[in-house]
Amino acid sequence: MAKQRILNKKSMDFLEAYLNNAAPTGYEWDGQKLWMDYLKPYVDEFITDTYGSAVGVINPEAHYKVVIEGHADEISWYVNYISDNGLIYVIRNGGSDHQIAPSKVVNIHTKKGIVKGVFGWPAIHTRSRAKEEPPKPENIFIDVGCKKKADVEKLGVHVGPMTVSSASTRFRALVWSCSYKRIKSKGVAMCSL
């Protein structure tokens, strides 16, 4: 009996597009649309709601149902204020872990497009050894390479519901450029870059 392939080019292309799509908490629609477009040939109907849920239904009249559930949003932040020296301070949007933020590359979504930045916090040589503080929402910031608040604002960044999402977790299939036969026999190596 021939084995049916689970991963093929179409499914890998979908997975890469889906995982690399920005879908911060409260703004999941683009990710859900990708998911629904991919599943359209396999389901009979979709149900969506104002909470960001998207459900694909197969055989809606069936007495018994099977649910496969997943979480669609990603970690994100809102711009809280911009300092005079061009550093951007943020607040959480959902359950973001500030402890892992320093040195993460981020995308700030603006009307002018994506602005790249990196999370920072006071350099080790500027921190008191007697009072070594861990990263906290109050002492971490995003640096976009500007020296003044006005320069940050010219990029389109402003205080308010601007979503900041991780840019350092790009999904790539490492061996997809190899022949499909190699992938089938060796499996697929994936990474977060």
PLM feature segments, named:
Residues 1-193:
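N-terminal hydrophobic/helix-forming segments and targeting peptides
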